[in-house]
Amino acid sequence: MRALAEFIMRGRVQATLVVAGCAALPLLYWLGAAAGCLVLLRRGLKDALGVLALGLLPALIWWLQFDDPRVLLVLLGSSSLALVLRASESWVRTLLVSVALGLVYSVMLGAAFRPQIEALAQEIVKILPLALGDLYQQLSVDERARFASLIAPVLTGLIAALLQIVSVLSLILGRYWQAMLYNPSGFGREFRSIRIPAGPAMLLLAGMVVGPNFGPQMALLAPICSVPLVFAGLALIHGLAAQKRLAKFWLVGLYVTLLLFMQLIYPLLVVLAIVDGLIDFRGRLASKDADNANGEG
């Protein structure tokens, strides 16, 4: 990874080759987005504009020729987040801005893939009686209709949230490269300090829980609003592991468990981030450790 980061920062030609080359490959576009973030974070928009403009050409081809806007959305989205992070130096603000980015993604995806999403939603509606069993039979006709109307917006929100996550991960990789080259160990301290305050955390929770009550289309807010909280939850785990000096094995176990049991660990991270916004686990633990060191605990 270090060799690739050094190659990207060697000059505009090298950076453009990586961004454009990765954007042309459907499974590596996230790597091109990370390269664009690295250039933007280090050199600013003026120097990065030419690199990004040429790198976006393959993404435009994917959209115009294959009706797939995802590569373009991630490249533009991660670059936008990089601009926010460079200007604010705040991961919390950047993660909150990613919610707006997710909403933009949902609009674009809804326009580009509406027939496919609606067809998939209809197939899911057909299997609901089998999936829910007796619970589905207990629902009234109106409740079944309302439940069915939420499926397409939720699917759109899930796809948008996935692209939102990829955009944030690309930014994280770009920031990690920047720290590796110019500020070793700086990224770890920066990431472990991420904590969404109580106010924004409650707003995100409201978007997830209350949003669907304002209409079926608002159901897409649930997955999109959860993304900043998940990253804050991961930062909390990293921060606590660092404070307790736990072996990296525990963090590896966390990510393996997250991949294997996503449906369980993902909401748990959301809950942890919300509670941390109210309690501040790391701050309390640091204060307790300081008291113990002073002989007061």
Question: PLM ranges: what are they?
Answer:
Residues M1-L54, K248:
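Hydrophobic transmembrane alpha-helices
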Residues T16-L17, L49-A53, L72, L95-L96, ...:
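Hydrophobic alpha-helical transmembrane segments
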Residues L31-V39, V71-S79, A219-V230, Y266-G277:
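Hydrophobic core segments of alpha-helical transmembrane domains in multi-pass membrane proteins
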Residues A59-L64, V71-F113:
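Short helix-perturbing small/polar motifs within transmembrane alpha-helices
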Residues M108-L155:
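Membrane-interface interhelical loops and short interface/amphipathic helices
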Residues T156-Y182:
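Transmembrane alpha-helical segments in integral membrane proteins
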Residues L181-A235:
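Small-residue-rich helix-loop
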Residues P223-G297:
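Long, positively charged, glycine-interspersed low-complexity recognition regions
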